[in-house]
Amino acid sequence: MAGAGSDSVRKFFATTQSAALFPEYVSRAVKQGIEEADMLPSVIATTTHINSLDYRTIASVPTDEEKKLVDVEEGAEIPETVVRTQESLVTLHKRGRMLVASYEALKYQKIDLFSVTLRQIGAHIARTQFADAVNVLINGDGNENAAATVSAATTGTLTYNDLLNLYNQLDPYCLNRLIMSPSTMLKVMSLDEFKNPLTGINFQGTGNPGNPLGAKLLRTNSVADGTIIGLDAGCALEMVVAADVNVDYDKLIDRQLERAVITTTAGFAKIFSGASAVLNVG
C-alpha cells in the first residue's frame, strides 16, 4: 500500500469483497492524519465517549476553606466536598468533509498518493477540534466558567513579569502548558530571560522551542495574536466524543463519481475552571 510498488486505488474495486474494505482504508488514513497533527493529547486531562447527543459533565467548586483538610475531632462531622452535574450541556460539534472524486481521478492513482490527501483531511479535523478546545479554555463551556484574565503591565508589550503573573494566577495548579499564536511565540522566545545558548541549540536540533517557566509551548493559529493561554493539562479540560471518525461511502453512477463522507462529533468541557488562565498582551 506504500512505496514505489504501491497498488492503484482501483485494486479496492476489483471484487465486491475488496470494495468493502475501502471505507475502512479511508477511516484509517484519516485517523492517521488526525494523530499526526493532533495537539489535543497535550491539553486534554481525560476523554469521555458517550452514546448520546446530550451530556452534562460534573464539577466540584470548593471554597478556599473547603480545600483545607482541617483536624476532625472524634465523633465530629467530617467536612464534605460536593460533586454535582453542570447546569448546561456540553456543546458537541460535528466536523466533517465530503471527498468527491471521478472514477478516473481515483482509480488510476496510487494508494500512497491518495493516502496523503486523506491524511490532510484528518489534519484539518484535528486543527479544528483544537480550535474548539481553545475556545472553551478561554470562554468556558456555557457554565459561567470563563478563564481568568491577566493583562500585561504595558499594553502591546510582553515582559517576563507578565508571564510570572500568569504563572501565579494558576496557583494552586501547575502551569505546564502555554498556548499561543506563532507571532506571540516569537515575542516570548525573544525575551532576554529565554535567550541562552542551550535553548538555541535545542531549537535548531529538535525544533522544540523550549519550555518557558517549565511549561510546554504549543503554537497554533487558533489563538489570537497577543493572547497566551496557560493551563494545568492534568485537570483543565475534558474531551467528550459522541462519534469517532465515521466514513460513509457511495457512488453516483450517472456521473461516475465516488463519494466518501468523513465525520466526527466531539465537544469539550472544563473540569476545574481555575486550572486555566489567559494573559492578554494586547
Describe each model-derived feature in a short phrase:
Residues 109-110, 187-189, 269-271:
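Short helix/loop capping segments that flank catalytic or ligand/cofactor-binding pockets
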Residues 21-95:
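Assembly/oligomerization interface modules of large self-assembling protein complexes
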Residues 97-170, 278-282:
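Alpha-helical scaffold segments that mediate packing/assembly in large oligomeric complexes
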Residues 2-3, 7-10, 192-282:
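Sequence/fold signature of self-assembling virion shell proteins
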Residues 1-28, 282:
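Intrinsically disordered, low-complexity terminal tails
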Residues 95-97, 176:
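Generic beta-strand structural signal
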Residues 139-209:
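Extended, solvent-exposed, turn-rich assembly/linker loops in the middle of proteins
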